[in-house]
UniProtKB/Swiss-Prot annotation:
One of its GO terms (molecular function) is dopamine:sodium symporter activity. The chain crosses the membrane at residues 57-95, 96-127, 128-171, 234-253, 254-284, 304-332, 333-373, 398-439, 440-463, 464-496, 514-539, 551-580. This is Sodium-dependent dopamine transporter. GO terms for cellular component: axon; neuron projection; plasma membrane. It comes from Bos taurus (Bovine). This protein is the target of psychomotor stimulants such as amphetamines or cocaine. Expressed in the neurons of the substantia nigra of the brain. The lineage of its organism: Eukaryota, Metazoa, Chordata, Craniata, Vertebrata. The keyword Transmembrane helix applies. Dopamine binds at residues 79, 149, 153, 317, 419-420. The record marks 105 as: Contributes to high-affinity binding to cocaine. GO terms for biological process: amino acid transport; dopamine transport; hyaloid vascular plexus regression; neurotransmitter transport; sodium ion transmembrane transport.
Length: 693
């Protein structure tokens, strides 16, 4: 072998244009594998798609204002769970002491994961599936996020329909859940809760008018024997669901230009209502005692594993990571947007909202506890029962009860709408970016998505719909989300590389993430997520609703729903490997190498070229260890030859239509060859350079 030439044992690669063309710009590139066996050269080739041009990236829709994006993210992250879940967990797990594990997990895992998703979407400017061009074998992680978002839409929209039903029912002089004199009430209904008693004289359990209105007047649960006896959809709830679907469609059909305007109402209204309810709640008798119980500090509870587990799980679900929503929203940002600042702002607002909503919730719970002379623990609960039974019951006892009920359910409606918009946007953006046909017909595709969620949501508005709702809530958005986020952070930090990801962020913000963020992404967050996944499986309990226990077949169906989203990751990985040419080692090398060059999308249209990631199992070769050679021109076969050192100047390769090589990519003076794997990274293709292994 000639002097100065890198030794390539038995295999070499050529990256050359598939056919000669005079037009400038990105070309389709043919990847040719040349393998020498027994003196015979065997070739295999495949056609590589060119990277997205800067012009195409510039054409992507962007938010009209920065505030549109921030309100959309805040509106999505701050949802109904902030009202019904966090205050209860805080009270249950030692009051103010619960903030210690909550804030700890927020800092070491919640904010880093939130920041990672915002940066991932903003840099790649695609939806949940498209961003995985950074590691094609893990594109299934994006489809998992899209599928989970779709599943959540099947039952989350029903909560909004319930809130709308309550809102419409509040426009009366007397709220329908005030007394027991309605057709849906049972003999067990009691207008007042007896102190320290939950049973009537004959041993039958007592129920409140608010509880019977929700379960019998709205859900008609008494007409169903279980999940195997659903009955027909209730026309009242179906009508409310139709209105919700129509509202979602017209909020989303034109993309972020319309949704960005809607969130100015849906994201800000809850704060106005929460403030009004807080002013009213703290004046009620018993409110101070309940707030004191909410904030009481019991540091001994920190020795209990359940407290830390509850905090970890709450962090995962309260921020909305793993659903593709943050990726979709940030993909419409300007390339130079400061996503780090956005992550800090939105996560802080989310946590403060969760904490402050506890004052509102417990002021009314304290009022109810004193009114019925029962301990605060007897009325404190989480889930739909808090906002559709306990809270309406408290509002019904206030002067101007109808006014306060309207205000409260307007808040629930707006909290639900912008969160549902985020979930739908994840599905629409994620699939539209993958399939251009859907992108060209976004309005029609949006209609199909919302119609699909409507049709499947009908199962949740039947007589036994609450059982379907509980099953979906238990399985569709549980372990599968945690698994998806775990695979996401492994893909970014270990396959794509935390150093390259940091370089991407530096291009956008001008600042490389500090060592703290890199350590969180690479070590702390994966360990945290693995811990939560294991705990969620180990502490699994079969779903139930009240005294009703789901049959075994329903539990099996729930696990099948969860597995259907998680299985997309290995299925797509197997498909990707099978669809690539070459040996198993070559397939794996190409499957974990980014598909396209990441470019800076700005008004200048320039796209800085990065050294390609050289696959070696997992991880990346640094560019200083690469051996750079010019590709041969069209029609020339055989292995490439090394280039002279490009010191202090740039060099263009006209036949590729590529820009000159930046000075910072000047190869080192000594050429170090790496294992014989093919490098097919478009960053090399676009400059006419190929890295020889």
């Amino acid at each position: 072998m000639s002097e100065g030439r890198c030794s390539v044992a038995h295999m070499s690669s050529v990256v050359a244009p598939a056919k000669e063309a005079n037009a400038m710009g990105p070309k389709a590139v043919e990847l040719v594998l040349v393998k020498e066996q027994n003196g015979v050269q065997l070739t295999n080739s495949t056609l590589l798609n060119p990277p997205q041009s800067p012009t195409e990236a510039q054409d992507r829709e962007t938010w009209s204002k920065k505030a549109d994006f921030l309100l959309s993210v805040i509106g999505f992250a701050v949802d109904l769970a902030n009202v019904w879940r966090f205050p209860y967990l805080c009270y249950k797990n030692g009051g103010g002491a619960f903030l210690v594990p909550y804030l700890f997990f927020m800092v070491v895992a919640g904010v880093p994961l939130f920041y990672m998703e915002l940066a991932l979407g903003q840099f790649n400017r695609e939806g949940a599936a498209g961003v995985w061009k950074i590691c094609p074998i893990l594109r299934g992680v994006g489809y998992t996020a899209i599928l989970i978002s779709l599943y959540i839409g099947f039952f989350y929209n029903v909560i909004i329909a319930w809130a709308l039903h309550y809102l419409l029912s509040s426009f009366t002089t007397e709220l329908p859940w005030t007394h027991c004199n309605h057709s849906w009430n049972s003999p067990r209904c009691s207008d007042a809760r007896a102190p320290n008693a939950s049973s009537g004289p004959n041993g039958t359990s007592r129920t409140t008018p608010a509880a019977e209105y929700f379960e019998r007047g709205v859900l008609h649960l008494h007409e169903s024997q279980g999940i195997d006896d659903l009955g027909p959809p209730r026309w009242q709830l179906t009508s409310c669901l139709v209105l919700v679907i129509v509202l979602l469609y017209f909020s989303l059909w034109k993309g972020v230009k319309t949704s960005g305007k809607v969130v100015w109402i849906t994201a800000t209204m809850p704060y106005v209502v929460l403030f009004a309810l807080l002013l009213r709640g703290i004046t009620l008798p018993g409110a101070v005692d309940a707030i004191r119980a909410y904030l009481s500090v019991d540091f001994h509870r920190l020795c209990e594993a359940s407290v830390w587990i509850d905090a970890a799980i709450q962090i995962c679900f309260s921020l909305g990571v793993g659903l593709g929503v943050l990726i979709a929203f940030s993909s419409y940002n300007k390339f130079t947007n400061n996503c780090y600042r956005d992550a800090i702002i939105t996560t802080s607002v989310n946590s403060l909202t969760s904490f402050s909503s506890g004052f509102v919730v417990f002021s009314f719970l304290g009022y109810m506890a004193q009114k019925h002379s029962v301990p605060i623990g007897d009325v404190a609960k989480d889930g739909p029962g808090l906002i559709f039974i306990i809270y309406p019951e408290a509002l019904a006892t206030l002067p101007l009860s109808s006014v306060w009920a309207v205000v409260f359910f307007v808040m629930l409606l707006t909290l639900g709408i912008d969160s549902a918009m985020g979930g739908m946007e994840s599905v629409i953006t994620g699939l539209a970016d993958e399939f251009q046909l859907l992108h060209r017909h976004r309005e029609l595709f949006t209609l199909l998505v919302v119609l699909a969620t409507f049709l499947l949501s009908l199962f949740c508005v039947t007589n036994g719909g609450i059982y379907v709702f509980t099953l979906l809530d238990h399985f569709a958005a549980g372990t599968s989300i945690l698994f998806g986020v775990l695979m996401e952070v492994i893909g970014v930090a270990w396959f794509y590389g935390v150093w390259q990801f940091s370089d991407d962020i530096k291009q956008m913000t001008g600042r490389r993430p500090s060592l703290y963020w890199r350590l969180c992404w690479k070590f702390v967050s994966p360990c945290f997520l693995l811990f939560v996944v294991v705990v969620s499986i180990a502490t699994f309990r079969p779903p139930h609703y009240g005294a009703y226990v789901f049959p075994e077949w329903a539990t099996a169906l729930g696990w099948a729903i969860a597995a259907s989203s998680m299985s997309v990751v290995p299925i797509y990985a197997a498909y990707k490997l099978c669809s690539l040419p070459g040996s198993s080692r070559e397939k794996l090398a190409y499957a974990i190498t980014p598909e396209t060059e990441h470019g800076r999308v700005d008004s200048g249209g320039g796209a800085p070229v990065h050294a390609p990631p050289l696959a070696r199992g997992v991880g990346r070769w640094r560019k200083r260890k690469s051996c750079w050679v010019p590709s041969r021109g069209p029609g020339r076969g055989g292995p490439p030859t090394p280039s002279p050192r490009l010191a202090g100047h740039t060099r263009a390769f006209p036949w590729t239509g590529a820009p000159p090589v930046p000075r910072e990519l000047t190869p080192p003076s000594t050429c170090r060859c790496v294992p014989p794997l093919v490098c097919a990274h478009p960053a090399v293709e676009s400059t006419g350079l190929c890295s020889v292994y």
